[in-house]
Amino acid sequence: MNLFKYFREEIIKSVEAIVPGLDTSKVTAEPPREVSHGDVATNAAMVLTKAAGMKPRDLAEKIAEVLRAHPAVTGVEVAGPGFINLRLADSFWFERLAEVLAAGTAYGQSDLGRGHKVNVEYVSANPTGPMHIGHARGAVFGDALASLLVKAGYDVTREYYVNDAGSQVDVLARSAFLRYREALGEEIGEIPEGLYPGEYLKPAGEALAKKHGPALKDKPEEEWLPELRGFAVDAMLDMIKGDLAGLGVRHDVFVSERGLVEAGKVQDALDYLTAKGLIYEGVLEPPKGKLPDDWEARPQTLFKATEFGDDVDRPLKKSDGSWTYFASDIAYHLDKYRRGFGAMIDVWGADHGGYVKRMQAAVKAVSEGGGDLDVKLCQMVNLLKGGQPYKMSKRAGTFVTLRDLVEAVGKDVVRFIMLTRKNDAHLDFDLDKVLEQSRDNPVFYVQYAHARCHSVMRHAAGMWPDAVGPVPGVEVLAHLTDPAELGLIRLLAGWPRLVESAAEAHEPHRVAFYLYDLAAAFHGLWNKGKDDTSLRFLIEDDRELSLARLGLLRAVVGVIASGLGIFGVAPVEEMR
């Protein structure tokens, strides 16, 4: 139950009882900024004052009068110019705690997105080598966002777009051919400039030698290049999939750019736009500032991107007559739309920020306004050790591999830390700090809360065999009267709202912030028990109170596990 949604409906009912027929779409119910102000705050009187023909405070008092009769409400205050703050009965919170316990890790599951399909495309790295640390953040972000949307009830497809039609694939094929010759015993010396130098291509060369023997060695390029394009791309994709699997990242669909081109879908998309009058031959204005050396005023095939919010119209063909990347991307997004995805989310690196407007313009054009593209840009990750910039050993060319990072600190640590900042903010990843056992290390702090709960439950099972059997009912949970206990229940009851708001905003980092706050509230209660023995979770001569507190711990365990599940992180029952 999203209690804030529930009370929004109750507030709207109270408004209807006073002034029927008002537009209540702007009415909100949310946690007050200050905990001391109550449990639920609403702007109803402020946003409806004009339509109701009443002063805000007068309307607020009338709404408050109706709400005071609600059985879960113990107090209603009108604050400032007309804000309304509600205080809820302890019994209401005990019912919410029972709800958490009944649902377990399914608590927070929502039907917000029921009936809505969403395509989340992430990673989509060029298939020219292994994954590196620069790919890790977008991979984890996209995977966690997809899981968050599933938790909120959306029908999600996780997609990877394989850029296998560009000139870089020819370079990859030639690089693989060089490693093939090496596998046959030829001394290749230094890798020529323009080819990929990484050791990671050696297995591809060896596989080619095993498959063909020396048969390809003396053939002209035009005979072996077509086969090696596909072979090398497949080899690199297998490597990438292995890297992603090591990070716990998965995709449902891999879409080939070359497949789109060969199926005529690029031409089809441009024919569609031409029929709509959105493609023309023209000459672009020179770019502002210093002109690039290779810029020339020449007629080009252009898309009318400015009609859909872009700054300039965009070229669709290169000077050699081949399609631009943008033309292929238009076809790809039209293909997504025709597969039933009106809602699309693309996760890109921050260096692609200048590409956002044109892509959103293209989606508007090909979907005639029916499609929506949200582009999430992931900023750089700064790798540190002991607070200083750090470069790990490089086993694959000139970059740090994702596999190196996962081997150094573990999959779960990488995933959690990558989600502790908003995607468009720079992230520091300190190899020492992420392994510290302190509250400054969020992944440890959250996991420690989960493990501590399990430690208490194991101890309780030794005291009372049925201590962690059936979940306690409301009458037992009513023994939780300490303000810190009630505060923890309020935090747990806010999880469904957090899931929905994070899903709507496409911001999984909110889950990390919430889990940290939940862990802090739990650790605070634990520490109170060290100072005051009456607040310990287990009191041998008060079984009922102990069972109530065990119920609270079981709820904390369920919600932490639920949040970590969204992140693809396994909750631990013991710290090692």
UniProtKB/Swiss-Prot annotation:
Residue positions of motif 'HIGH' region: 125-135
**SUPFAM superfamilies according to UniProt:** Anticodon-binding domain of a subclass of class I aminoacyl-tRNA synthetases, Arginyl-tRNA synthetase (ArgRS), N-terminal 'additional' domain, Nucleotidylyl transferase
Gene Ontology cellular component?
A: cytoplasm
Q: Which InterPro entries match?
A: aa-tRNA-synth_I_CS (IPR001412), Arg-tRNA-ligase (IPR001278), Arg-tRNA-synth_N (IPR005148), Arg-tRNA-synth_N_sf (IPR036695), ArgRS_core (IPR035684), DALR_anticod-bd (IPR008909), Rossmann-like_a/b/a_fold (IPR014729), tRNAsynth_Ia_anticodon-bd (IPR009080)
Task: Identify the stretch annotated as signal peptide in this record.
Answer: none
Q: Name one GO molecular function term.
A: ATP binding
Gene Ontology biological process terms, A to Z? arginyl-tRNA aminoacylation
Q: What is the uppermost EC class here?
A: ligase
| Catalysed reaction equations from the record | tRNA(Arg) + L-arginine + ATP = L-arginyl-tRNA(Arg) + AMP + diphosphate
E.C. no: 6.1.1.19
A matching Pfam family: tRNA-synt_1d
Q: Which UniProt keywords apply?
A: Aminoacyl-tRNA synthetase, ATP-binding, Cytoplasm, Ligase, Nucleotide-binding, Protein biosynthesis
Q: What is its main location?
A: cytoplasm
Q: Where in the cell is it found?
A: Cytoplasm
**Family, per the entry?**
Belongs to the class-I aminoacyl-tRNA synthetase family.
According to the record's subunit comment, the protein's assembly and interactions are: Monomer.
What's the protein called, per UniProt?
Answer: Arginine--tRNA ligase
- What organism is recorded for this protein? Paramagnetospirillum magneticum (strain ATCC 700264 / AMB-1) (Magnetospirillum magneticum)
Q: Gene name?
A: argS
